[in-house]
């Protein structure tokens, strides 16, 4: 039994005696329902009456909770500055700020998605351009390789054309030989002329007979 008592004491120490200060402040303002807002003193009185709290020690935490509530939008300061003055709940404004945050987050997400799409489109365009340029370069290189063997093949054609010209030049002297033989034939006719002179001699014999 003596060992079980310390365990129950530890559980009592671990359990908080009151909720967080911000929750107590909101509860005080909602319970007071003052049109002009609840003052810091009224909030302290409500917390001291409804919660087991040392209000002197909790005063600094209450001031911090009020300032933080105004900054977050959960509270609205109607009068005064800082922790002094009167405060109301700012649920409507808080809801608006949350909605605005959600809208801003949605807009940011849309902008991010658009930027990603634009980047992807630009990347695709650059890739397509690079591929086209690479294809053009490859086609030009292939065309150059095809043109070089064609130029080499033309040179043997020129050599083949020159050889028939040499044969034609060789045939021309062969055609001149018959022309020389034809020129020799008139010489044979000249040798036949003395034969005619020899035929005239019998006429001289006829004169002697007379």
UniProtKB/Swiss-Prot annotation:
Keywords: Chromosome, DNA-binding, Nucleus
Region (Disordered): 1-21, 86-210
Compartment list: Nucleus; Chromosome
Keyword Nucleotidyltransferase tagged: no
GO cellular component: nucleosome; nucleus
Pfam families named among the record's database cross-references: Linker_histone (PF00538)
Domain of life: Eukaryota
InterPro entries tied to this protein: H1/H5 (IPR005819), Histone_H1/H5_H15 (IPR005818), WH-like_DNA-bd_sf (IPR036388), WH_DNA-bd_sf (IPR036390)
Similarity section: Belongs to the histone H1/H5 family.
Protein name, UniProt field: Late histone H1
Lineage: Eukaryota, Metazoa, Echinodermata, Eleutherozoa, Echinozoa
């Amino acid at each position: 039994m003596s060992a079980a008592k310390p365990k129950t004491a530890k559980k009592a120490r671990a359990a908080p005696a009151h909720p967080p200060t911000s929750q107590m402040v909101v509860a005080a303002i909602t319970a007071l329902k003052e049109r002009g807002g609840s003052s810091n003193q009224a909030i302290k009185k409500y917390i001291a009456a409804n919660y087991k709290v040392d209000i002197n020690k909790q005063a600094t935490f209450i001031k911090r909770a009020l300032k933080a509530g105004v900054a977050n939008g959960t509270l609205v300061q109607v009068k005064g500055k800082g922790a002094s003055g009167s405060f109301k709940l700012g649920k409507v404004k808080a809801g608006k700020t949350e909605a605005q945050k959600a809208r801003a987050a949605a807009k940011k997400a849309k902008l991010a998605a658009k930027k990603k799409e634009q980047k992807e489109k630009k990347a695709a365009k650059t890739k397509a351009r690079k591929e086209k340029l690479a294809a053009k370069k490859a086609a030009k290189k292939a065309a150059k390789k095809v043109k070089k063997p064609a130029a080499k093949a033309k040179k043997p054609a020129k050599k083949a054309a020159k050889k028939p010209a040499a044969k034609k030049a060789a045939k021309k002297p062969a055609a001149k030989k018959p022309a020389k033989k034809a020129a020799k034939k008139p010489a044979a006719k000249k040798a036949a002329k003395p034969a005619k002179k020899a035929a005239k001699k019998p006429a001289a014999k006829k004169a002697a007979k007379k």
